[in-house]
Design a protein with these regions (language model features):
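A general alpha-helix detector
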Residues: 254, 258, 585, 599, ...
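Alpha-helical bundle protein-protein interaction modules that mediate dimerization/oligomerization
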Residues: 606, 619-704
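Charged, amphipathic alpha-helical linker/scaffold segments
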Residues: 583-634
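Alpha-helical structural elements of signaling/regulatory helical domains
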Residues: 267, 595-596, 652-655
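Extended, non-catalytic interaction/assembly segments in eukaryotic proteins
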Residues: 1-72, 79-90, 99-594, 601-602, ...
């Protein structure tokens, strides 16, 4: 049994009921709305599934509480066990009326403190969807509010200042580093709050409470006051929860009808949606939306978070053999939630990408978060006699901006999506407790699928910092190999954009020859390698690890001329293919006025868009240049001139990545050109020109909540 870290007395005094939460590294979120709010606590500490702690938080525990001197809150406490993280994206950052606290222990080395804070800040940033209308400087109109808290100051033997508060020597470099990385994406508080773990009435605690109260009051000042309808709904919800039955789920239309029938027959749907959003912010209900489960109202979040998810994903679940593969019988799911309608429950869990129903065997359900089988299939088998006639290729998806792991739980969701894809595209007569033979195999941090003579392995690599997709097949099936790789990459990138809409991924390519030789480490080619080679008129790249060159065709298309000849590469790809997040970053770089004129204005003239200069120049004198969200409170920021420039320029057929990159270098903006070089797409296929290629079979991908 794992030992339990010491609990901070001061943090326990901040709100009651948190005595079973480690404060080594975690994040809390206060969501004040009207008279209440939500406090969320979660930790990045990875706990082995075999480690059981009777006092540990299971899934998400919710309680109402009062923070002394601040106000009433609904406290959401998230388990640090990563098995539960596959559901956190629906609750962690789904409301703008929030204050997030990221806590880390000052006992840890500085590098660990920076790593832990970066992980959580990157998670919050990744969960924030981008705005389609990009504001000046790429600013967000309502960035999440974040407070950094260093704990165990007394244990770390920090000295006190003249006012009695702790002084941390590395506070300024830590805040500077984090602000440089996230200051334009999140509203970071101006200081690091350093906590004394043994003094609940210390000045440090009082400063933190005062800051929380200030933030809370600011948020409440922008919220609508509690209406009579809301007061009646808050009073009525407890009785509705009792009448709803075993599942605390209700369709939006039924919720609307009940409100009109029992509370106010004149209430409109639009007005009720606003009230429901406020109830959502208060933690009274939770609104869940999906194209498969339309507008579901979760009447009691505790039922799902503290009940169903805690039992389903618990490490105490019986350890039958098939459970090590993450597969359950529907009857076992029913036993974990005996009072629930299991079919209705599975629809919601399926829409949340927590489980996947096996269409070839409807009595079985895949729950990848519970897989305990280790990497038995992390490399290709070597039993094929025709090994030399196989072709290989691969892609690695990584976060483009910050070298940090993907948020925990992402790969479990990817496994769910791949299970769903496999179930929808294949049939089999396998045994009840076995996955379809040859179609899909799952293990911890890995998946293996096959289709049409090609097979793929999808792996979580580099300590969670990359998702790697390797594909191989017979050399006579090169187009099918490309199709399978394209399908797997598309599923992965679609999941990233829906689950982590604020995370910008980059696509790297793996050396096909080294994959065939099965020798590591594998050479990884980045977008900049292809674009630089194109600029020099080359169509191959140097593998410095292997001592040879590899052609674009072999790296990008398995050497298939049918695919490669109907594609565009790097510099020739149209600017409209550059992602919204990449455009937003360019706006941050080019919008602020430059002393030498090397900004959007001169770029517009170089691109022949002089009409935009007069249109937007009048806004420059009143628009902040490069302020962080913490200091810039303009409620209606002006439109980004760089975004308008790219929008107008993209209507031209000759507006390519290569042209823009050249203009940026002529302008002397190497920073913007290098960023474009780093994140631009490398390869685009005109699907209609490829027989059997392109994105075949993608019709089975399910939308996400």
């Amino acid at each position: 049994m794992a030992s339990k870290p010491a609990v901070s007395v001061s943090i326990s005094n901040l709100y009651p009921g948190c005595e079973n939460v480690s404060v080594r590294s975690r994040s809390m979120m206060f969501e004040p709305s009207l008279t209440k709010g939500v406090l969320e606590v979660f930790s990045p500490v990875t706990t082995a599934l075999s480690s059981v702690d009777d006092l540990a938080t299971r899934a998400i525990e919710i309680q109402n509480s009062n923070i002394n001197g601040v106000g009433d809150f609904s406290v959401w406490e998230f388990s640090g066990n990563t098995v539960y993280h596959c559901c956190y994206d629906y609750f962690v950052a789904n409301d703008p009326t929030a204050i997030h606290l990221i806590l880390f222990s000052l006992e840890e080395p500085y590098e660990m403190q920076l790593s832990q804070a970066t992980y959580w800040l990157n998670t919050l940033k990744a969960l924030t969807p981008p705005q389609h209308n990009i504001a000046f400087g790429g600013r967000l109109q309502n960035p999440l509010k974040v407070v950094l808290v260093g704990t165990h100051a007394d244990v770390a033997s920090l000295i006190r200042g003249p006012g009695g508060e702790f002084c941390y020597a590395k506070e300024k470099p830590l805040l500077k580093e984090l602000r440089n990385r996230f200051g334009l994406d999140l509203q970071l508080s101006e200081r690091l709050f350093v906590m004394d773990t043994g003094a609940s009435n210390s000045k440090d605690i009082k400063l933190l409470r005062s800051h929380l109260l200030e933030l809370r009051n600011t948020i409440l000042s922008t919220c609508n006051p509690m209406s009579g309808l809301m007061e009646r709904l808050v009073a009525t919800l407890p009785s509705w929860r009792k009448l709803t039955g075993p599942n605390q789920l209700m369709s939006w239309q039924q919720f609307l009808c009940d409100v009109q029938e029992h509370i106010n027959p004149l209430v409109s749907e639009d007005h009720l949606r606003g009230v429901a959003q406020q109830l959502h912010s208060m933690g009274e209900i939770n609104l869940m939306q999906s194209e498969t489960v339309q507008d579901v109202v979760l009447l009691d979040p505790r039922w799902l978070c503290s009940g169903v998810l805690a039992r389903l994903l618990s490490m105490d679940t019986p350890k039958a053999i098939h459970h090590y593969r993450g597969r359950y019988r529907v009857e076992e799911i029913q036993a974990l939630a005996p009072e629930s309608d299991v079919e209705e429950l599975l629809q919601v869990l399926d829409a949340m990408d927590i489980c996947a129903r096996d269409l070839t065997n409807p009595g079985m359900v895949d729950v990848p978060a519970l897989i305990k089988t280790n990497g038995l299939h992390r490399s290709w088998t070597e039993e094929e006699e025709d090994h030399d006639v196989l072709v290989y290729g691969g892609v690695r998806l990584v976060p483009a901006e910050h070298l940090t792991p993907f948020p925990c739980g992402l790969f479990h969701k990817l496994q769910v999506n791949l299970c769903r894809w496999s179930h929808q595209h294949h049939t089999g007569d396998d045994a009840v407790d076995e996955p379809p033979d040859g179609d899909i195999r799952l293990w911890t941090n890995g998946v293996k699928v096959s289709q049409g003579g090609a097979e793929a392995m999808i792996l979580l690599v580099n300590h969670g910092q990359g998702v790697e997709i390797q594909v191989r097949g017979h050399e006579s099936e090169r187009a099918k190999c490309y199709t399978l790789l394209d399908t797997m990459v598309t599923i992965s990138e679609s999941l990233l954009s829906s689950t982590l809409p604020g995370l910008l991924p980059a696509r790297y390519y793996l050396s096909p020859q080294q994959l065939q030789e099965q020798h590591g480490p594998i050479m990884v080619y980045q977008p900049k390698d292809f674009l630089r080679a194109q600029t020099q008129g080359e169509s191959s790249l140097s593998n410095t690890m292997g001592g040879y060159r590899e052609s674009f065709s072999s790296i990008l298309a398995f050497g298939c001329a049918e695919v490669y000849n109907h594609s565009r590469q790097g510099r020739d790809i149209h600017i409209s293919q550059v992602s919204l997040l990449a455009r937003r970053k360019l706006c941050r770089l080019l919008d602020p006025p430059d002393a030498l004129g090397k900004d959007w204005c001169l770029l517009a003239m170089n691109l022949g868009l002089t009409q935009l200069v007069a249109k937007h120049s009048s806004n420059l004198s009143t628009t902040p240049t490069n302020e962080s969200p913490a200091t810039n409170t303009d409620p209606s920021p002006s439109t980004s001139p760089t975004a308008e420039l790219l929008k107008d320029w993209s209507v031209r057929p000759d507006s390519t990545v290569g042209v823009l990159m050249g203009k940026l270098r002529e302008l002397g903006r190497r920073d913007a050109a290098d960023f474009l070089l780093k994140t631009s797409p490398v390869f685009r296929v005109q699907v209609e020109g490829v027989v059997g290629g392109g994105r075949a079979g993608l019709g089975g991908i399910r939308p996400h909540l």
